[in-house]
A protein has these predicted regions:
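Generic structural signal for buried aliphatic residues
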Residues: 36, 105-108
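Ser/Thr-glycine-rich phosphate-binding loops at phosphate-binding pockets of nucleotides
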Residues: 131-137
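Ferredoxin-reductase
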Residues: 1-100
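A short, basic/flexible loop-to-alpha-helix module at the beginning of a structural domain
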Residues: 111-121
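Reductase modules of NAD(P)H-dependent flavoproteins
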Residues: 156-260
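Histidine-anchored nucleotide/phosphate-binding helix
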Residues: 137-148
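Conserved beta-strand elements of the Class I
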Residues: 126-129, 223
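Short, surface-exposed secondary-structure boundary micro-motifs
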Residues: 41, 110-111
Length: 260
């Protein structure tokens, strides 16, 4: 069942990491915004400093699986990059926290999901709203050349976290902006006070309510990934502003990743 290898592991904080994994058969084809299930057996060591897991595994050989959005571009064929927050009482992430480079693990053979840009017309701007590791699919999108192939398209990223140390990928986003990408970035921190203008204080939904980000259903497609409370509030706000939820049967301009 273990069919992939951890090839890189970066700990951003004590409970936030970037993991790169290489499936034995190579990186499968996928679209930015999709996710993959990975897992480790219950017998794998778990971080000892964390509280006991909420559900003890009864079969130590059974693979504990969870799904994670992919942060790497589909153009990257060496490995898949995952942005992972440790859940202290969880079953998988405390085991991933113990894993070292070279560790074997399970990776689903297929990458799936409908939270992609496939149905977005090229003349539409993108507003990408996330909290925590919900940023991952948007990093994949902005790393992918085809996202930028549409003249006049502008992309806005709002990323909400508790502490500024949790603003993963901030430096990469700023480098893209400095290089001339038509990209706006609004980092939002809820539990620290900003120094100068390094971030905004509060919650991402506040900066959609107050007009910091101008939204027009005729011009913009909004994508949301992260905390369900944020998603519900933003969805309600945008439905009142004549946005419509996208589905396979009914195309719209409001795209929601329900997994959390």
């Amino acid at each position: 069942m273990e069919n992939a290898t951890i090839v890189e592991r970066t700990l951003l904080t004590s409970d936030l990491m970037i993991l790169k994994i290489k499936p034995d058969g190579g990186v499968p084809s996928f679209l930015s915004g999709q996710y993959i299930a990975i897992g480790m057996p219950g017998r794998a060591p778990r971080a000892s400093h964390l509280p006991p897991e909420a559900e003890q595994p009864t079969d130590l050989d059974k693979i504990i699986k969870r799904a994670y959005s992919i942060g790497s571009s589909p153009e990257e064929k060496d490995a898949l990059e995952l942005y992972i927050a440790v859940v202290p009482t969880g079953s998988l992430t405390p085991r991933l926290l113990c894993a070292e480079v070279g560790q074997r693990l399970f990776a689903a053979p297929k990458i799936v999901g409908t939270f992609t840009l496939a149905d977005v017309p090229g003349d539409k701007n993108l507003v990408l709203v996330s909290t925590g590791t919900g940023l991952a699919p948007f990093i994949s999108m902005i790393r992918t050349a085809s996202t930028w192939e549409h003249p006049g398209r502008r992309i806005t990223i709002l990323h909400g976290v508790r502490h500024k140390a949790d603003l993963g990928y901030q430096e990469e986003i700023y480098r893209m902006i400095a290089a001339g990408a038509p990209l706006d970035y609004i980092p939002v921190v809820s539990r620290e006070e900003p120094v100068a203008d390094e971030f905004k204080k509060g919650y991402v939904q506040h900066f959609l309510h107050d007009g910091t980000v101008s939204l027009d259903p005729a011009r913009d497609h909004v994508f949301m990934c992260g905390n369900p409370a944020m998603i519900n509030e933003v969805e309600s706000l945008l439905l009142d502003r004549n946005f419509t939820v996208h589905s396979k049967k009914q195309p719209g301009n409001l795209h929601v990743e329900k997994y959390w």
